[in-house]
Regions:
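Extracellular glycan-targeting catalytic surfaces
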Residues: 1-302, 317-318, 348, 546
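Extended polysaccharide-engagement surfaces of secreted carbohydrate-active enzymes
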Residues: 2-7, 11-14, 22, 26-29, ...
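Flexible helix-coil junctions and inter-repeat linker/turn elements that act as hinges
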Residues: 303-307
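Active/binding-pocket-proximal capping segment
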Residues: 316-320, 539
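Short sequence/structural elements of tandem HEAT/ARM alpha-solenoid repeats
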Residues: 311-315
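Structured alpha-helical bundle/scaffold domains in large eukaryotic membrane-trafficking regulators
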Residues: 194, 198, 234-245, 309, ...
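Histidine-acidic residue clusters that define the catalytic metal-binding segment
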Residues: 321-331
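Alpha-helix N-cap/helix-initiation motif
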Residues: 152, 215, 286, 332-337, ...
Length: 546
């Protein structure tokens, strides 16, 4: 209650979780859907609205399950699709386990509710049975898209994350109880999801797609987030074994589930085997940009078995750090300030959690792997005049500035996730590199207020006074000379001071992950402008990319 910034973080977490807290246990349990609706990453990636005919591409369709469940809204004309009552149709197809089976559903419900007369020419307009609405040779997969971007992401998964965060910042056991209900129901059904065999449409094609509920890259992030959430609420949920077992065992009996949920051990087994062990057994479904998959598996193993598997987890983490920092502190993936930031941001995320377990862990890592420090120096050394990064590979757009540090995201409302500001300060204490403090300070709008935005960190007044000492001594401008990242093959020549600073860069290799084939690519920043702008992320050439 002492600090306004802390109250703000806590209150925001509570506000986000409130809608799920207000739901009945039965309604919460009902949120998780089965796998039998063909899922898709786009309604029609290069398509238009069937009503107003205006372009509605890629991810522009609006899903708001709280206000309009089982509907998408056109952002141009505000019409909602599908036009049939899919919620009623969906429920009519439930089997004895509470899972939708299309062959059991009442197809007499497949009509435009605004035009119920079969003789009306609009009687079937906009009607989707789960496999899309077809007209004039085109298919709009409204429900397949909604299931992921509405129901799963905004109802089920968001509920797990928000409830667990609220529990972490309040200690109120009601949040842990509600989160456990969601996690348990996900545990019932998660192993039955396989994006590749259940539609798996991405850009209107299915070949090569992988995933779980979502496609591979999001599936990887989603299951790791659920592991963090489960870890947060574990003790609070376990303490409510009688209430949880009473409700979940009743549901198990009513829906003829194999796990009776009679005890916390049953519930724990259902969550851990259904979500996390299943993920470990199907790595291909979450295979993503390095090191996201390895990191996800590490987090799952740590959550399930720490500290008994401490040595194995630390060995896996060391392997991740070694590979992620092998190329001048980076993984070697191109796309500077974009894809290349995946590795350092991943390292920061996992290290924030590990330092909570052992405050001396970061020093041990830097002593053993000095390249870990370079992972966060790289995006300092290659940033030009605090506004630009060289356009190397798939990144950015023509002439667009990079106003923020790209090595990780400085978010002031991290709530239960830990603070990147605290992490950078700890890294400074280990390395004595003042540029880390300067970046942290500038990322906080060049002010001390609110630092370190960490509900679980040290006294903020002491933290701020220490940051002030560094800034008073070093200033806010990071003094950088010319650099040559020989392994990453990027050189930057710098000259001038203040408003006359300028930088000439050359990328002297080609290809690589998210790299381009334009060897010896050059650029020049001066007078606040990119005077030799690269085109940035190239045209993809398919779907609705523009």
């Amino acid at each position: 209650e002492k600090h306004e910034w802390a109250r703000s973080i806590r209150d925001a977490a509570v506000t986000k979780a409130q809608p799920w807290l207000d739901m009945s246990d039965d309604s919460l349990w009902d949120l998780m859907m089965g796998p039998n609706i063909p899922r898709t990453w786009h309604v029609w990636s290069d398509g238009h609205c069937p009503s107003c005919k205006q372009d509605v591409r890629m991810y522009d369709w609006i899903a708001d399950p709280w206000k309009h469940p089982w509907k998408l809204q056109c952002p141009k004309c505000a019409e909602r699709f599908p036009k049939n009552d899919f919620e009623k149709f969906h429920r009519s197809g439930f089997d004895e386990h509470g899972v939708f089976q299309s062959d059991r559903a009442d197809r007499s419900l497949l009509f435009n509710t605004g035009h119920p007369d079969p003789a009306d020419p609009l009687h079937t307009f906009g009607v989707d049975d789960g496999d899309g609405y077809v007209a004039d040779g085109h298919r709009w997969r409204f429900i397949g898209y909604y299931v992921i971007f509405g129901h799963w992401k905004k109802w089920v998964h968001a509920g797990i994350e928000n409830l667990s965060a609220a529990y972490a910042v309040t200690g109120d056991a009601r949040y842990a109880y509600k989160a456990a209900i969601l996690l348990d129901r996900v545990g019932d059904l998660y192993p039955s999801f396989d994006f590749h065999t259940q539609g798996g449409w991405v850009y209107e094609i299915t070949s090569g797609t992988r995933g779980q509920v979502s496609t591979w890259h999001d599936a990887c992030e989603e299951v790791r987030a659920m592991a963090y959430a489960y870890d947060r609420i574990y003790d609070g949920a376990k303490a409510q074994e009688p209430a949880l077992a009473a409700f979940l065992s009743r549901q198990a009996a009513a829906y003829k589930l194999t796990n009776t949920k009679a005890t916390w051990a049953d519930i724990q087994r259902n969550i851990e085997s259904g979500i996390f062990e299943d993920t470990l057994a199907h790595r291909n479904r979450i295979e993503s940009n390095y090191p996201r998959t390895d990191m996800t598996n590490l987090v799952i193993n740590a959550v399930l078995r720490w500290p008994s598997n401490r040595e194995a987890v630390l060995s896996d983490l060391d392997a991740i750090i070694e590979k992620s920092t092998a190329v001048d502190g980076m993984s070697g993936e191109k796309g500077l300030a974009g894809y290349s930031s995946i590795a350092p941001s991943a390292l920061a995320e996992i290290m924030i959690q590990m330092v909570r377990l052992d405050p001396e862990f970061l020093k041990t890592v830097v002593d053993l792997r000095p390249s870990f420090h370079q992972a966060f120096r790289f995006n300092i050394d290659t940033r030009c005049m605090e506004e630009w990064y060289p356009r190397v590979g798939d990144t950015g757009a023509f002439g667009r500035k990079n106003s923020r540090y790209a090595g990780l995201s400085f978010t002031p409302d991290s709530a239960a996730d830990g603070s990147p500001y605290s992490f950078f300060w700890k890294l400074y204490e280990v390395t004595n590199d003042p540029a880390l403090v300067q970046v942290m300070y500038l990322s906080n709008e060049a002010k001390l207020d609110g630092l370190p935005h960490d509900l679980f960190g040290e006294d903020p007044e002491i933290f701020q006074s220490r940051v002030k000492e560094v800034i008073d001594r070093e200033g806010t401008e990071i003094n950088l000379g010319s650099v040559n990242k020989q392994n990453w093959c990027l050189a930057i020549l710098r000259s001038g001071e203040g408003a006359d600073r300028r930088a000439l860069w050359i990328d002297y290799d080609s290809g690589g992950g998210h790299g381009h084939m334009d060897g010896m690519n050059i650029g020049y920043f001066s007078k606040g402008l990119d005077l030799v702008p690269d085109f940035g992320y190239p045209p993809v050439g398919y779907g609705g990319w523009t």
